[in-house]
Amino acid sequence: FGPLVPMLSFKSFDEVIERANDNDLGLCSYVCTNSMETANLASEQLETGSVAVNTGVVAIAEAPFGGIKQSGYGREGGSMAIKDYLNVKYTHMGIKG
């Protein structure tokens, strides 16, 4: 068993984004490019919880990790993760003593 990399041909950047987003899953995406502009556009347009550019590493302890769509619930890791375990309550007291 090992990692698999599907290789698909495409004619335009828009086609890549459309094909990548056309599914019910959204855990993470991987982008290989030499263009910072392409990397930024892909990161903005891909419907995933995280995007790795030119690396296979997408999760680190300091960053939130989790998917969107049918890939998981909420975020793990980072400061955002604690919000899933909190129940915020507001209490206003008009006590005169």
Where are these regions (language model features)?
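Conserved C-terminal structural/oligomerization subdomain of aldehyde/semialdehyde dehydrogenase
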Residues: 1-97
